[in-house]
Amino acid sequence: MTKRRLAAGIGAFILLIVTAQGAGANTPDKPKPNGRVLIISLPEITWSDLTQRDAPTIRGILDQGAVGGLTTRTITRVTALTEGYLTVGAGTKAIGKGLKPILLTSKGAGLEVGEKFGTGTAADAYEQRTGQSARQPIVYLGIAAAIAAQQEETYDAKIGALGDALKRAGYNSAAIGNADRTTSKSSAPEYERSLVTALMDSHGQLGGGEVGSELIEVNAKAPFGLQINIDTAVSAFDDAWKPRSVVLVEGSDLARVDAYRNVVSPKQTLAITREALRRTDAMVKKMMTKVDLERDTVIVLSPSPPSTTVPLGVAGMAGPGIDAGLLRSATTRRDGFVQLVDIAPTVLTQLGIKVPETMNGKPFTVTQTDMDANARRDFLIDSDQASQFRDSMITPVAIVFIIMIALLVVGAII
């Protein structure tokens, strides 16, 4: 155990006590008519990544709003990207695999209905798998398997609950992103468009956005030789960002970076992560010119952790009536910490929509604190390091405990 990690753990514990004794949590102001919510998804990004000077726009949003460490664990200890998005959409811990696993060709297959899939189109495949017609422009081909997987688990998550609630209330939902690892011309496409599952309805259909191959462009220096086309993504956002709408925008280059990390050096991993963050921030900067934080809510989240570790993710919220401070929810009951299941109830609460009983998560509240933006970020980084150290010690301590018990038993027998 290093001195720095010990100090981080002690510091985080002291800060947690201090902030818990501060001002009580408060709920943001009542939503304004025709309000909108922008969800910025940063796959596999942690608070440590955001201390770099590569994301000034995203950091600016977080600095003026309330922030927290996001627990991304769902049913399994390590949450894959699909499980993270399914959980966001359900407001309850969800899983993307089970006794009836989602096929690899479908797990991330959120497709525009006219896209080629197999010998036909995505619309054809959707109807063949569900027996329903595709009535929305985007469909999730893994919907039947996803629903079946939940029935094998304790939580019995209602897939698409957030999308259903938004639709009932007359809100438009859209997703913009494409983290595919192959081009559309590949004979064996590797789809990674699971962002669709966060806002789709319970039928696996989504009313707007863009997730097709038009969103990616070739760059030989990027992971898998692909990167998001920023101008196309911004244009798609402009079309989707209308009154009474919820739009999820994914930093898809970040997801490709994480999938690529096993074949590059640690130094190069840092370099491509920083480049992906810079490009994501540039995209968000252009989109934010259309966002009014006096009326609109922006939520920033990391839907899944890096594939190599299980750190706390990033959570942040800015908008009407949201003071700078620390996020909290009735799920965690701790200042500065929220869970992935809290995202959906928060979106609905910000829009004045009743939260369905099927959702176990609770909406964010904000606890005011004397810490400035840098101190809040440092607190979350230190808390994350302390949490990872604690997790790393569980197995060794358990082994020592078992050995000691065994020795005591042997000693008693002798």
Report each predicted region and the residues it spans.
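Soluble extramembrane regions of membrane proteins in the secretory/endomembrane system
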Residues: 24-392
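Bacterial N-terminal signal peptides
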Residues: 9-18
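Core alpha-helical transmembrane segments of integral membrane proteins
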Residues: 381-414
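Bacterial N-terminal signal peptides that target proteins for export
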Residues: 1-10
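Hydrophobic membrane-targeting alpha-helices
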Residues: 18-23, 409-413
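Short, low-complexity disordered leader/linker segments with a strong preference
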Residues: 6, 22-25
